[in-house]
Regions:
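A residue-level marker of the well-folded mature domains of exported/periplasmic proteins
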Residues: 1-361
């Protein structure tokens, strides 16, 4: 983009709690004379929004946040990527591996149980794990999934422990994750269990078990916010990058663990369908939902006689109360342009079992 090192200021190790984020944002705006400021952690949002209100001539952009739509602050913006697309594609690779294991007699169809290590029982995690499961199930219909939550975005010991429990206690034969350390991949390598990771390849930590990984690529968003700021053009209030915009990427497939040529061909086919809009990850015909309002299970959902979703009141404004129906044209519109960029799919669909829950706090 032609920026010099002096034009890019990076501040690290900013905690989510306390006033550190606000202080850093004010310093960047007031003292460093930055024109656009980007924060990358969910807990930074309230402090970044506070700074945005005080410096209206500076653009403030926040990854994974939920407040831009309702805050009404013109220089405050949220951004996310449709990582559920990448997780779905990675799930297809997992399903192909399960089919290989069934064909080789290593497991029966009923034993195609996926384990998933999640950080928190939040929409972001639930959306990702569900899209991964739906991808696997699209090619391995007998697949089911069990989930254990650690209560932390990054805790290698807890993540390894959760993955080990999924393998040993819950009889899971393939593991994936929405947690940030090498805990789950390490457990898989030690136990010889196939693994699909997240946020980058973990091949070096699991050469005998790693299959593929999906990740968010923020470069297209950085380019957009810089170019728009330079041109004096508006930055979208809610921006969502996709596979088509190269904002969602996948690693290479480990051909030592899964049939590489056929797997890559199938993944490319699915990516083409996503790009063409002929495949919707959360097509309501591809999953069923049990509603048990008494026990607060999917209470915001309405389903038909076949348990297919017909309406879902999602929490778009971030107040933990469903307010907007996001089901239309036969699919759940996750991270929709007219809603918000951050995920709001928090339905526990049939076929997925939470071994525990952890909402933080």
């Amino acid at each position: 983009m032609g920026l010099s090192d002096e034009q890019v200021v990076i501040v690290t190790n900013i905690p989510e709690t306390g006033s550190d984020c606000y202080d850093a944002a004010v310093d960047l705006a007031k003292n460093k004379k930055c024109n656009v400021i980007f924060a990358d952690s969910f807990g930074h949002e309230s402090n970044l929004l506070k700074a945005a209100k005080e410096y209206p001539d500076v653009q403030f952009c926040h990854a994974t946040g939920t407040s831009a739509k309702t805050a009404g602050v013109k220089n405050f913006h949220n951004a996310f990527a449709a990582i559920y697309e990448g997780r779905y594609v990675a799930g297809v690779a997992a399903g192909i591996k399960l089919n290989e294991m069934i064909k080789e007699g290593k497991i029966t169809a009923d034993q195609a149980v996926i384990g998933y290590v999640g950080a928190f029982t939040y929409a972001e995690v639930i959306s990702g794990m569900t899209s991964f499961y739906l991808g696997a199930k699209s090619v391995c219909p007998s697949a089911t999934m069990k989930v254990r939550y650690t209560g932390s975005w990054y805790d290698q010991a807890l993540e390894q422990e959760a993955a080990t429990s999924l393998i040993e206690q819950d009889k899971c034969v393939l593991i994936s994750q929405h947690a940030d350390s090498l805990g789950a991949p390490t457990a898989c390598e030690l136990k010889g269990v196939p693994n699909v990771s997240y946020n980058g390849s973990t091949y070096e930590a699991g050469k005998n078990t790693f299959i593929v990984s999906s990740a968010i690529n923020w470069a297209p968003y950085f380019q957009l916010i810089i170019e728009n700021t330079v041109k004096g053009e508006e930055i979208p209030t809610n921006w969502v990058g996709t596979i088509a915009t190269n904002s969602v990427v996948l690693s290479g497939v480990n051909q030592d663990v899964v049939d590489g040529e056929s797997t890559v061909a199938e993944l490319n086919k699915v990516i083409d369908q996503l790009n063409a809009g002929t495949l919707h990850v959360f097509d309501v015909n591809n999953f069923t939902v049990t509603v048990d309002a008494k026990n607060k299970l999917n209470a915001n959902a309405k389903v038909d006689e076949n348990k297919h979703l017909t309406e879902y009141m999602a929490d778009i404004d971030g107040d933990y109360v469903g307010d907007t129906n996001v089901v239309h044209d036969g699919y759940f519109d996750e991270s929709g342009d007219s809603f918000r960029s951050a995920p709001y799919f928090d339905i526990i669909i049939d076929g997925i079992t939470n071994i525990n829950t952890n909402y933080g706090g």
